[in-house]
Amino acid sequence: MLTQSLFLTVLTLALSLVSKTSASQCSPRYGTCGGIYYDGPTCCVVGSSCIYSNPWYSQCIPVDYTGPCAKLYQQCGGINYNGPTCCEPGSECIYNGPYYSQCIPVDIDPSSSSSSAASSTTSTTSSSSLVSSTTLTSSSPSAVSSTTSIPSISSTISSSVSTSSFTSLSSSGFSTVLSSTNTTSALPSSGWNVTGY
């Protein structure tokens, strides 16, 4: 009887060591459990499940997790991200790189946006990426250079300049400040031609 009792004790001890070793090799709650180039454990500790977010990232989420999903345009995944990986209704978690996924509305199609969104985008684009160099030339040897956000300008200015800069050329609601390189000269009476590229 002593032998059978000793055998059961050793067997129980061995099984508990094996299960502890297996559990310690699994990812903890909210830990990474999968993804391209991920070389860590792909199992999760008891009480959580490995949830796929995108090809680069899967995370151990508690089975009893009842927390809120990420709101529209919030982060919903990525390497070292420890937050909700689900998105509120009407949006989905879109992969934007290995470190960032974001909740994007399901019905957004970049090619068909509303007119107000289009004009907002156009306005932003005009101020940040449609920058061109404009040169004013005249028959006199001095020239004036400026940078403008107006895509193209063709106009004539025929007034005197006595300060170092002036505002002119209002086209489609945009105005630009042109800086003079020679402030002692006046504009010729025939005018300066302003062209933009």
From Swiss-Prot:
Family annotation (InterPro entries): CBD_sf, Cellulose-bd_dom_fun
A single GO cellular-component term on record: cell surface
A biological process from GO: carbohydrate metabolic process
Protein name: Carbohydrate-binding domain-containing protein C2E1P3.05c
Subcellular location: Secreted
PROSITE patterns to which the protein is assigned, alphabetical: CBM1_1 (PS00562), CBM1_2 (PS51164)
Major subcellular location class: secreted
Record keyword ATP-binding present: no
GO MF terms, alphabetically ordered: cellulose binding
Membrane found in the keyword field: no
First and last residue of the signal peptide: 1-23
Region named Disordered: 115-163
CBM1 domain boundaries: 25-61, 68-104
S-S bonds: C33-C50, C44-C60, C76-C93, C87-C103
Lineage: Eukaryota, Fungi, Dikarya, Ascomycota, Taphrinomycotina
Glycosylation sites: N182, N193
Keywords: Disulfide bond, Glycoprotein, Repeat, Secreted, Signal
